[in-house]
């Protein structure tokens, strides 16, 4: 421990029991290099480390997204959306919404890294729909109400008649429906830059 005027304070260096870079995640840029590591569930990491210590599992160290037969998914404490593996090193992260009526949905979670204030601006741009030349077009959404707080997401969005059913009927190869695509309720995270 370090000494501060005769008082023992913090350790000279810290050796964590679990790899906190995998718990907290990291995203950074250095001179000529970058690194992006998503957060992983500490319970899964501890479980894996215990199995590794007790040699109950053999592992080929290919990447942190897939250690042998033990699968790690990106994890965000309190996130109510979904995380799905879509490729060897790629994960789809979706926010959450529910259909309230024929033309109304309620968004209760945004994708990781999307904040409510910029999202409100994005929704306003869908109401004030203009083309690249500034010509006014028909609004993509009719109206929205935000009751979001610093700790919760709550957007109620009203679509023009029939638009919601049209959006719900389309899905892409990653099972992203038209609502999620239009309202940017999905994003991807990769483990190829660790």
Short names for language-model regions:
Residues 1-194:
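Intrinsically disordered, low-complexity regulatory segments
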